A protein has these predicted regions:
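Short, well-ordered amphipathic alpha-helical segments that serve as non-catalytic structural scaffolds
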Residues: 23-38, 63, 67, 93, ...
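Conserved catalytic cysteine-centered active-site region
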Residues: 2-5, 54-109, 116-148, 186-212
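Phosphate/pyrophosphate-binding loops at sites that engage ATP/ADP/AMP, CoA/4′-phosphopantetheine
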Residues: 31-45, 156-161
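Conserved small/polar residues in nucleotide/adenosyl-binding loops
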Residues: 217-219
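N-terminal leader/propeptide and maturation segments of large enzyme subunits in energy/redox metabolism
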Residues: 143-195
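Beta-strand segments within the central parallel beta-sheet cores of soluble alpha/beta enzyme folds
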Residues: 41-51, 78-85, 109-113, 165-172
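Generic N-terminal amphipathic, Lys/Arg-enriched alpha-helix
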Residues: 3-18
């Protein structure tokens, strides 16, 4: 196995990016990552894009080839692969590229995670996200990702004695990290007490425990 390094990055701001299409965001971040790495398109052996929802929210499948085309990589004749694993799609795309490079199959990969979740209504995006659950036994029964994670949290509390204060500290920690990132959707810190006092969504998860809908691309 060979060592693998991340040599360049490009990222959009996290949030409601209504003024730009998925392909425009892909072009912006793809070129930024390539320039940051100091490479050219001739150096790239493969493209991996993690995406869950474009087929539902944008009626656009085959997004890896779309982004390759708009980034000027189509003439390089490299494999462009879409990776889907619900909310972990971007992370799994990194894993696939890592395995290909570490195994010696390729030398350089462009890897990205891309979603446009705010171009549709909240109900439509919630329905799309619920497709990542079991359609027959969970989604059809009305389960959402939030309610399923609430059940997981309840079981964790029962098994390990996890407290409300500990759950709030997780959200507060995440918001603190966001306060250090100018590209974050909500770049400000939160006190754990504010998390505990926010509105209930699905017991025991409150509003500030839950991830908001957003659009972004990072490569």
């Amino acid at each position: 196995m060979r060592d693998v390094s991340i040599i360049g990055v490009g990222i959009t701001k996290f949030g409601e990016l209504w003024d730009k299409s998925l392909r425009e965001l892909g072009l912006e971040t793809g070129l930024a990552a390539i320039n940051d790495a100091g490479i050219t398109s001739n150096d790239i052996d493969a493209l991996y894009i993690g995406n869950m929802a474009a087929g539902s929210t944008l009626q656009q499948e085959h997004v890896s080839a779309l982004i390759a085309d708009y980034c000027g990589l189509a003439n390089q004749n490299i494999p462009a692969t879409r990776v889907e694993a619900a909310s972990a799609s971007g992370g799994l795309a990194i894993r696939q590229a890592y395995m290909a490079i570490a195994g010696g199959f390729i030398d350089v990969a462009v890897v990205g995670g891309a979603e446009k979740m705010t171009d549709v209504s909240d109900s439509e995006s919630s329905y799309t996200v619920s497709m990542g659950s079991d359609e027959q036994w969970e989604a059809k029964a009305g389960a959402t990702f939030t309610s399923l994670h609430a059940i997981i949290a309840q079981n964790h509390m029962l098994e390990y004695g996890t407290t409300r204060e500990q759950l709030s500290s997780v959200a507060a920690k995440n918001h603190y990290h966001a306060s250090l990132n100018p590209m974050a959707q909500f770049p400000f810190a939160l006190d754990p007490a504010a998390v505990s006092k926010s509105g209930m969504v699905s017991t025991p998860l409150r509003m500030l425990d839950c991830a908001p809908n957003l659009s972004l691309i990072h490569i």
